């Protein structure tokens, strides 16, 4: 677990938010909105494992920055769905590209073929764990 925490910290340091109008909390929520499409604030809070009130604050910041927009759920007009704006999508893409470029370079420069295979297998296992319902 410590290794995953260290790698996450390294990825963040390789893609600093200094020139971006968001925090890491904003960016992770925005990334999930881009990946999942329109989502309610409650669903997003559950997925991010934060309180609904905390997510409301995060969404307010994203909304103020023009990175998300609200719309009604076509199947249930009482629900408000949050979607990424084109600016929000571009921000996620730019941030992800920077981190992915660093990681790809590090993998190709530091790992041999066997280590690369092991890493791919470990990623599959971590995906399975992340998707677990328990």
PLM feature spans:
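C-terminal regulatory/oligomerization modules of transcriptional regulators
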Residues: 113-134
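N-terminal helix-turn-helix DNA-binding core of bacterial DNA-binding proteins
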Residues: 11-54, 65, 81
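Short, locally clustered residues in the helix-turn-helix/winged-helix DNA-binding domain
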Residues: 31-35, 96, 124
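Charged, amphipathic alpha-helical coiled-coil/dimerization segments
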Residues: 60-117
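Conserved catalytic core of two-component sensor histidine kinases
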Residues: 56-57, 120
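Short amphipathic alpha-helical/adjacent loop interface patches that line ligand
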Residues: 4, 26, 48, 59, ...
């Amino acid at each position: 677990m410590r290794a995953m925490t260290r790698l996450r910290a390294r990825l963040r340091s390789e893609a600093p938010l200094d020139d971006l109008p968001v925090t890491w909390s904003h960016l992770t929520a925005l990334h999930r909105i881009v990946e999942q499409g329109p989502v309610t604030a409650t669903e997003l809070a559950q997925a991010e494992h934060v309180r609904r009130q905390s997510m409301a604050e995060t969404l307010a910041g994203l909304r103020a920055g023009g990175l998300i927009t609200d719309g009604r759920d076509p199947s249930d007009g009482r629900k408000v769905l949050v979607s990424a704006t084109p600016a929000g999508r571009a921000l996620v893409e730019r941030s992800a590209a920077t981190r992915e470029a660093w990681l790809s370079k590090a993998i190709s420069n530091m790992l041999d073929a066997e280590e690369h295979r092991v890493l791919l297998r470990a990623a599959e296992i971590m995906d399975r764990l992340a998707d677990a319902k328990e």
